[in-house]
Amino acid sequence: MAPNLSPNPSNSLDAFAAEKLAGLEAAALRRRLAVTARGPEAAAERGGRRLVSFSCNDYLGLAHDPRVIAAASDALRRYGAGAGASRLVTGNSPPLAALEERLARHKGKEAALVFGSGYLANLGIAPALVGQGDLILIDDLGHSCLFAGARMSGALTLRFTHNDVAQLRALLAEQRGAARRALILTERVFSMDGDRAPLAEILALAGAYDAWTLVDDAHGLGVVEPGQRAPLEMGTLSKTLGSYGGYLCASRAVIDLLTSRARSLVYTTGLPPASAAAALKALEIVEAEPEHAARPLMLARRFTARLGLPEATSPIVPVLVGAAESALALSAALEARGFLVVAIRPPTVAPGTARLRVAFSAAHDAAQVDALAEALAELAPDSLRAA
């Protein structure tokens, strides 16, 4: 059959994109990139305006610490701007090797493996460990990359209701016998709600059913007490450590296996040496100066107390709004008052639960926290009553 060469807008790429964008716009779900110049002390500049940012995961302000910047600058001069190859070729730089050794020691594990990002780490870990005939059980509020890695593995993947240990137990009792291997995926601190997983109970269940547990510690490292460690401890270098990248800490055997089998490590360029050096210096500071760790949570609790919200258990506090349009409007109103608090909308969160995700840093001061609380009390009293 000869191809139809007549113009057909409904089949064109641009028409398809325009139609989808119109639907997103109508639902207040279209995403846009906004140029943001981050500075020290929780400052951010957008559109020529200086704002106080409560939408950054730099929980200890280490991205602007002069010691971290100096470490990155030194690595940049010594090793160049990029790794130049995958880690298994020539992209495994000295700062990367030193960082892995320090991460493993910090987590109490035998070894560590650094990936290009936390997302890439979770894309690679599950498929390297489980597959068809295996079982993955994942918390319903787990990060998107946990679900993406689970799907790529080919294992039977079942969700359990957020932090519902009883349901997790029931699923293990029902499904574990038919599976060769089982993997439980959860987070130490949940990124959009700021609450914490009941890890002691989950790990006890895992032991009873011979299941492996991966804990995503992206938002916990350095700012919350870790409690009991899981066999698989992954996280990022881009939040508390102020740099970029992701990692897994585990036994030497597991790390050696992933070095050969994790496709998101094998088939991508290694992390830039400067990023690794920055993360290494930041981790050294976290360990040497533990007095900073409690400040983000202290400020978060000051904020929740001012507004009558449930007491914070991490530096992340959600202010639930509901409709995406309302969350955008509240974010814009706060920006007009000098605060950058970005609206979080579906599909990042469930429909009807759009929110402002307020993130606290050691770089904030009490006056900034109180001013934000005062503005929210005036602008969003209904959201605060609903909490």
UniProtKB/Swiss-Prot annotation:
Pathway note: Cofactor biosynthesis; biotin biosynthesis
GO biological processes: biotin biosynthetic process
Catalytic activity: 6-carboxyhexanoyl-[ACP] + L-alanine + H(+) = (8S)-8-amino-7-oxononanoate + holo-[ACP] + CO2
Cofactor: pyridoxal 5'-phosphate
UniProt-annotated binding residues for pyridoxal 5'-phosphate: 118-119, 191, 216-219, 236-239
EC annotation from Swiss-Prot or TrEMBL: 2.3.1.47
Transmembrane segments: none
Signal peptide: none
Modified residues (N6-(pyridoxal phosphate)lysine): 239
Domain of life: Bacteria
Sequence similarity: Belongs to the class-II pyridoxal-phosphate-dependent aminotransferase family. BioF subfamily.
Subunit relationships: Homodimer.
PANTHER family referenced in this protein's UniProt entry, alphabetically: 8-AMINO-7-OXONONANOATE SYNTHASE, CLASS II AMINOTRANSFERASE/8-AMINO-7-OXONONANOATE SYNTHASE
Protein name: 8-amino-7-oxononanoate synthase
Biological source species: Methylorubrum populi (strain ATCC BAA-705 / NCIMB 13946 / BJ001)
